[in-house]
């Protein structure tokens, strides 16, 4: 085995937003650099600068290639493809140059645009893919609205990914369910996301507040949550719901009007860095997602002593929540039962406390020290 102070390069689109992948990459990069003493570089393609939304150690270097694939989102399909191929060619050239310059021991990709060519870069590094989405949502296209040629293109593209994943030295997924999603692959390892908080206290569970944290998107299910809350607020007239999320809340404001939801007790906020503070000011965490690669928000809330309610969607929640023990799992997408579970927790401080204590114990499995050790063992194994 080589000197175990490895050079690690992370390839991920961006660090500037408040997404789960950005949070996890930042936490692990900090641990690898500050605790394990690795030489860590993160290479991004998006954002005007390399600034991270989440805290990033001074020991972690960031290289921004400035390709800005995100500017293609509003282009027509044909123009998008032509410009994408041009940017992709430049990305391959720039990333190859950086990897040949850095000569990392290990290159980790979050399986975005570089997965199409990263195995062909002969820089001598081991290549690890890190999958943060369920298979059904990896490179998903909404077939309800897409033209037939777009559907064909994306399905063809998606199938080609399997070959690229097979060539990786290792593919890391977040749950055991996710392992079973990829029967074609024999190079899989399960390592969960790490808890990103250093929690020093626990919620008193006395505030009359339900909280959720995520992204204003279809996958996160806030349209469903508002329908659920329209039931809850009628029975629990002194409780409030606070949603902290990145993205545009405008469609949800309209939905609140349509459902006659009391805006004095249901608040749509932008994303926050200090999520621990919001957990500690709350008494229940809800996660109404249609799909989750893992469910880091659940672990964070549990670490702060909150009972949690989540749909039993693929893939993450069932690996974290034991229904009726440290939280509630609700069959997708049973709005009435979800509302009843919230009301049940609102009605009993003892139940909130019992579930919160069990959840807090469960969250210890995801401490960065534990997860980081699993990554270290993987690195050592690959570098033998």
What are these regions (language model features)?
Residues 177, 194:
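Carbohydrate-associated surface elements
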């Amino acid at each position: 085995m080589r000197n175990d102070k490895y050079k690690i390069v992370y390839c991920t689109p961006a660090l500037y937003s408040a997404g789960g992948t950005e949070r996890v990459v930042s936490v692990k990069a900090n641990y690898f650099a500050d605790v394990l003493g690795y030489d860590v570089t993160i290479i991004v393609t998006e954002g005007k600068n390399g600034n991270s939304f989440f805290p990033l150690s001074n020991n972690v270097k960031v290289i921004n290639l400035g390709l800005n694939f995100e500017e293609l989102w509003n282009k027509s399909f044909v123009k998008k493809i032509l410009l994408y191929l041009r940017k992709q060619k430049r990305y391959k050239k720039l990333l190859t140059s950086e990897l040949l310059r850095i000569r990392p021991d290990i290159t980790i990709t979050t399986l975005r645009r570089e997965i199409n060519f990263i195995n062909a870069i002969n820089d001598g590094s081991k290549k690890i893919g890190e999958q943060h989405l369920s298979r059904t949502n990896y490179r998903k296209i909404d077939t309800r609205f897409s033209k037939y040629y777009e559907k064909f293109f994306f399905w063809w593209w998606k199938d080609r990914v399997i070959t690229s994943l097979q060539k990786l030295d290792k593919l890391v997924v977040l749950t055991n369910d996710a392992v079973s999603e990829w029967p074609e692959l024999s190079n899989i390892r399960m390592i969960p996301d790490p808890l990103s908080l250093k929690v020093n206290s626990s919620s008193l569970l006395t505030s009359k507040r339900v909280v959720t944290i995520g992204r204003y998107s279809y996958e996160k299910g806030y349209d469903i949550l508002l329908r659920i809350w329209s039931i809850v607020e009628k029975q629990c007239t002194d409780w409030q719901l606070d949603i902290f999320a990145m993205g545009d809340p405008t469609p949800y404001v309209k939905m609140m009007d349509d459902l006659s939801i009391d805006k004095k007790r249901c608040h749509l906020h932008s994303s926050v860095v200090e999520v621990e503070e919001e957990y500690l000011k709350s008494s229940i965490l809800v996660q109404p997602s249609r799909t989750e690669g893992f469910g880091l928000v659940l672990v964070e809330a549990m670490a702060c002593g909150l009972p949690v309610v989540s749909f039993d969607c693929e893939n993450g929640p069932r690996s974290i929540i034991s229904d009726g023990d440290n939280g509630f799992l609700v069959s997708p997408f049973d709005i009435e039962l979800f509302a009843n579970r919230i009301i049940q927790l609102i009605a009993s401080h003892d139940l909130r406390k019992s579930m919160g204590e069990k959840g807090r114990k469960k969250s210890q499995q995801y401490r960065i020290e534990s997860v980081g050790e699993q990554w270290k063992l993987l690195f050592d194994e690959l570098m033998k």
